[in-house]
Every structure is written in structure tokens, then in C-alpha cells.
Amino acid sequence: MKENKIKSSNGGRRMLIVLGTVLCIAAIIGLAVAYNRLRDIWLEQCVITDAAAQVSITDGKMVRADVIAYMFGLKNGANLALIDFDEKRKETMKKIPNIRDISIARQLPDKVSITVEERVPVVRLGIKGEKKDSGRVADTEGVVFISSNGTQMLPIIREAAAPGTDKGHTLSGRALAALRLLETCRDNFRALAAIEADISKPDYITVVLGNDYSIAKIAWDGMDDPSDATQKNLEKQLDHLTKAYTSRIDDSIRVWNATLPPSETRSRKSEVYGGTQKGFL
């Protein structure tokens, strides 16, 4: 009798387990179906049906809105929920170095706003001995890109040999030092009117001074490793050069030598090599 009761009890438990398992499976299937249905409804709401109304792109001077729309795949029929905007942003910035940043704002479910920030060129790049405009420019971060729109009046860095720093790359070493030199002249030492920096020489940068087209050979401690510390050395050298240049100690000087530390040149600032037209500061 007891044995029958035990068997009956065990059989009841098994039935409950089976029933519970079936109910769990049914619930999981139901949830999956419901999730997929809800997902389909959501995806349907994210489709671009009117790109002009649903997509807003603020472009720049060089990179146009249609290019950005193409790179991101923003067109009628595209689904905003299926676009990996972070990945598209990275790909676009890699392919178009003119772009400094891209801001993306989603307005769920079916709108998106994109703002493009372009790089601002501060110098042109060329090759020593070549007159042809390469179209290469660099911004204050040293990133090289192509731009010919309104860049003719920018100062130029002459690299030693072709092809020079390619677009999409960043200036380094002596080229970056020349960029910092020209920017510092523009911001703090305008009396020099520096318009060109030739980095083909191993020991110094040759700078053309725009007021009279005289030449200045400039070097400073740590010039090939630009940093806040070495920037101070550059500023000291330019300050010393500016004082000598504006004092017009000798109008026959066509080449200024600013390669020595100021401490070594104070006693020699009036010394001029007449035959070679080289002046020590």
C-alpha cells in the first residue's frame, strides 16, 4: 500500500516537472515571438522614407553633405537602427583627413543629425626646389590633408625631399618643429613676418622673413622633440632674434644666425661677416 502511494507520488512529481518544462518552453517561445514582433515593429519605424526631412547634415567648406550621407549610407530605404554610426564615423574620418570631428545625434526613432567639423589649415606644405603647389596643408595639430581653398597666403614649410608627409599622416620631428615655429611667429612675433620655413638642413630651420625677404637660420634646444618645455626655448630664441632684427643694427645683413643659445650670442650681436652677409645676433 505504502509502495503504491510512493509510486503515485513520484509519478505526480514527474508530471509536474514535465508540465513545468513544457510551460517554460512555451513561455520562452512566446517571449521570443513577441520580442521579434516588437523588434520588427521598431525597425519599421526606423526606416528612412524622406531623407530630406529625416536626415540633417551640417557640412563644411570642403566636405559636402552628400559625401557624408553616402559614407554613412543615409538614403531612402536605409534603416537607422541597423547603421553602426560609431564605426561609420571612424571610417569616414580615416578616409577624409580634412575632417577633424563628426558629431552624431539620434532623434528616435527615425531622425538623425550630423555635424561635420573640418580642419583649419594653418600652413602649406611643399618640397624644397619645387614651385608647384602640392595642395597639401596642415592644421595646428600637424595633421596633413589636401586643401586649395583660400590657402595661398598661408606660410609654407619646405620639406627636404618628395613626396613629403602624405595626407592623413601627422607632422613629426623637424616638420612639426617648423609648424610650431611659424605658429609662434604668427601669434607672438609678428615683426618677423615669417612666411617660409625650409627644413632641409640638418642643424637648423631656414626661415624667410617677409618684411625684407632676409633669411634667418634658427635652432633651439629640443627642436626635434616639440613640447611645452622646448617651446620656451623656441620663444627665447625668437625673442632674441626679433630684438636684433627690429633694431636694424646693420641694414646690409641678409642672413641672421639664430642657431646659438642666447647666452652665447649676447656678446656677438653686432658681429657681421660682411663678405658672406651673415649676421650673428
Range-by-range predicted roles:
Residues M1-V55, D66, Y70-E91, R100-L281:
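Charged, solvent-exposed interaction patches on well-folded alpha/beta domains
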Residues G60:
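Conserved glycine-rich "GG(E/T)P / GGGxP" loop and the immediately following alpha-helix
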